[in-house]
């Protein structure tokens, strides 16, 4: 007698991403990558000590994924997050805005307990 096993697959679309991008942010990232002329570039998002609230966000382009990095693919672009920054960025949203204060990436972070007035630093 032959038996069959039923396997339950998890719908990956139902798992919330580590970080989310707005369409504005994804479009700007794609535009910057196109300007650089390298399709291998990914946006590295990180947290460092500093700023008036204790931690600050940083952005840089990187072609290499380091050991322990988490890679997030959304809306046609890729983000890299190092293991230390991951705990501070999980669940955050990256937007891109242009206003009176200039153009900038803005992070809406549910892990931040306080943020400074300019939004570039936070405490957790």
Swiss-Prot record:
Biological process terms from the Gene Ontology for this record are: iron-sulfur cluster assembly
Q: What remark does the entry make about the cofactor?
A: Binds 1 iron-sulfur cluster per subunit.
> What keywords appear on the UniProt entry?
Iron, Iron-sulfur, Metal-binding
According to the UniProt entry, its GO molecular function terms are:
2 iron, 2 sulfur cluster binding; 4 iron, 4 sulfur cluster binding; iron ion binding
Task: Output the PROSITE patterns linked to this UniProt entry.
Answer: HESB (PS01152)
User: What are the required cofactors?
Assistant: iron-sulfur cluster
User: Per its UniProt entry, which superkingdom is the organism in?
Assistant: Bacteria
| PANTHER family associated with the record | IRON-SULFUR CLUSTER ASSEMBLY 2 HOMOLOG, MITOCHONDRIAL
Q: What's the subunit arrangement here? A: Homodimer.
Function, as annotated: Required for insertion of 4Fe-4S clusters for at least IspG.
State the name under which the record lists this protein. Iron-sulfur cluster insertion protein ErpA
Its source organism is Acidithiobacillus ferrooxidans (strain ATCC 23270 / DSM 14882 / CIP 104768 / NCIMB 8455)
Source species taxonomy: Bacteria, Pseudomonadati, Pseudomonadota, Acidithiobacillia, Acidithiobacillales
